[in-house]
């Protein structure tokens, strides 16, 4: 009997992607985050769809509609808490996934890496427009501050900002279009994920050692399906604990007040997952310079493959590069902390030093470390 999973046109694609896929036998738990991100995306789309059924994108009723979801809709409070905290889990997995890619040299699969960076930017855009929708104080002022950055672009800046706003300030037109963007972007993300996987399966997965794993591969199912299932359970457990016991711990208290254009909150700050970029933006005292640094802080990921100087792919056997990688990690945590602090000393100078160190590590120190490690490994006799 012919196996349908190997002959049916649709089943064949699923089979080659998730069942009979040859996978390196030594990939660690750091390779779980791809599937966890897929799960996060599914959770966000499903909870978001049900929230959209009850939400109204009008400045007069948006805030009330979110309150109505939490109070009057069956399990609406759960949907909202899962969606809000699901975004945090999504970004946590994203940062760990990108970090894994940098540590183990996965960025040398250039197409997969570049699509991944585009995915990161798209997810960030989705999260930003989504944060505006509840129309609380921080939603409104966050939208005002970030969209205002467009006006720093020479010549066309002001026109561009007003075009995004649909008026002369953030108002009803802005909220309506942001809701439209927030609804469509996850489906664009899903399409990009398919392309991301398509390019990944052209080359096969990297592995911790960074050497060609073709001589030692095992089928994805059952070995990695069961491993992913464990990851799913741990992620769901973490998300449920967060959403059920401490749903507002990652949010801003200002967002429990309806948006008021006449009253500016004392400290305008985005959600925690944008704070590192916000700190880099604030550390430059020039508006256009700050915007360029903000863009560079994310787009720098695109040139990481060009900065690879080592003869080894992975950092597994490169202690100097490992040290610099963990300094970079600590630096990003420092930037995240600074982004949430008021603009005053000593936070200003710490933020500026951390911003300089961020670019210095990626552009100069890590490539130099790779060259030095190559030199140290050369036979000296």
Swiss-Prot record:
GO cellular component terms listed in the entry, alphabetical order: mitochondrial inner membrane; respiratory chain complex III
Biological process annotations from GO: mitochondrial electron transport, ubiquinol to cytochrome c
Pfam families listed in its UniProt record: Cytochrom_B_C (PF00032), Cytochrome_B (PF00033)
Cell compartment(s), UniProt: Mitochondrion inner membrane
Binding site for a ubiquinone: 201
Note: Heme 1 (or BL or b562) is low-potential and absorbs at about 562 nm, and heme 2 (or BH or b566) is high-potential and absorbs at about 566 nm.
Protein name from the UniProt record: Cytochrome b
Species in which this protein is naturally found: Sarcophilus harrisii
């Amino acid at each position: 009997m012919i196996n349908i999973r190997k002959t049916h046109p649709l089943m064949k694609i699923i089979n080659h992607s998730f069942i009979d896929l040859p996978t390196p036998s030594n990939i660690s738990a750091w390779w779980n985050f791809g599937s966890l991100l897929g799960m996060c995306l599914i959770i966000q789309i499903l909870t978001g769809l049900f929230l959209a059924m009850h939400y109204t994108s009008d400045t007069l009723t948006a805030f009330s509609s979110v309150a109505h979801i939490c109070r009057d809709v069956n399990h609406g409070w759960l949907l909202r808490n899962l969606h809000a905290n699901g975004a945090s889990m999504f970004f946590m997995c994203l940062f760990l996934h990108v970090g894994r890619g940098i540590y183990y040299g996965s960025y040398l699969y250039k197409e997969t890496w570049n699509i991944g960076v585009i995915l990161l930017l798209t997810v960030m855009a989705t999260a930003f427009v989504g944060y505006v929708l509840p129309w609380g104080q921080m939603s409104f002022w966050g939208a005002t501050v970030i969209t205002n950055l467009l006006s720093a672009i020479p010549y066309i800046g002001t026109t561009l900002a007003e075009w995004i706003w649909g008026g002369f300030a953030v108002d009803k037109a802005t909220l309506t279009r942001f809701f439209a963007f927030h609804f469509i972007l996850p489906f664009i993300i899903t399409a990009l994920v398919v392309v991301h996987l398509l390019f990944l399966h052209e080359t096969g997965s990297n592995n911790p050692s960074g050497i060609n794993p073709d001589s030692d591969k095992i089928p994805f199912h059952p070995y990695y399906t069961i491993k992913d299932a464990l990851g799913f359970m741990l992620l769901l457990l973490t998300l449920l604990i967060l959403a059920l016991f401490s749903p507002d711990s990652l949010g801003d208290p200002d967002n429990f007040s309806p948006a008021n254009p006449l009253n500016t909150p004392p400290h305008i700050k985005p959600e925690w997952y944008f704070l590192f970029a916000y700190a880099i933006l604030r550390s430059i005292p020039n508006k256009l310079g700050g915007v360029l640094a903000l863009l560079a802080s994310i787009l720098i990921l695109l040139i990481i493959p060009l900065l690879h100087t080592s003869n080894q792919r992975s950092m597994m056997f490169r202690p100097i590069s490992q040290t610099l990688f963990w300094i970079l990690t600590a630096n990003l945590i420092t930037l995240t902390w600074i982004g949430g602090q008021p603009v005053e000393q000593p936070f200003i100078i710490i933020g500026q030093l951390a911003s300089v160190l961020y670019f210095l590590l990626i552009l100069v120190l890590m490539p130099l470390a790779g060259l030095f490690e190559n030199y140290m490994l050369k036979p000296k006799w």
